[in-house]
Amino acid sequence: AKRAFNTAKRYITFGVKDGVHSSVNERETRQNIAMLLDESLDEFLARKDLDGSISALTSLPAVECGWRSLEHFFSIINECTSYIVLRNADQVFKAKSDLHTDIDLLVSNINEFIAFSGAVKVKSNSHHAAYLINIAGYPVKFDLRTPEDGYYDASWAQEMLDSRVLKDGLYVPSPENAKWSLLYHALAHKKSVSADYAILF
């Protein structure tokens, strides 16, 4: 406890008045730049206008005022927290034209995802996975699952997150995990394999 207090005291003593603590590692740097500047770390570092001058931020983060599009939403969330689109990733960016379409995600940390996304739970039931996120002025439905909620085996769910791949701006399961998780979903969650899924096996 004394060591933690001394560390905190050092931050306070050497802190900048009216400043903001930025980060302690690359992950936190990515999160802060994405939230505050609305861009990825790579985009920020590629800037040609970084001359050391300081300017005030005058706009609210997107999580406060709403995301411009699903593409915008995922470009920022990709920098902030770990997730995968469980199914139908090729249809995600078409979901904006169909407000009845849920986007199914497995997230590593539900509280972190909610904080960065602005997701609002549809029902107060703690077991309900449905959330709404304001995208381009419309509520888009997301089903948010975690390794701990029993939707998939916890160790398998974590492995799916650990082995995720970036495809067309979205994190998705590896090809092998995509196949088996879809079959598991069809048999364990839906009790039957739909015609759409059957052609994949």
Language model features by range: what are they?
Residues V140, G150-S181, H185, A195:
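Core nucleotide-handling region used for phosphoryl-transfer chemistry
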Residues L41-V85:
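Helical scaffold of the NTase/Pol beta-like nucleotidyltransferase catalytic core
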Residues A186-F201:
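Hydrophobic alpha-helical interaction segments
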Residues A1-L60:
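Non-catalytic terminal and connector segments of soluble metabolic enzymes
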Residues K2, N111-G118:
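Short, conserved charged micro-motifs
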Residues R68-F113:
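Active-site nucleotide-donor binding segment shared across nucleotidyl transfer reactions
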Residues K121-M160:
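Conserved catalytic core of two-metal-ion nucleotidyltransferases
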Residues R68, R87-D90, I103, S117-A136:
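Catalytic domains that recognize anionic headgroups
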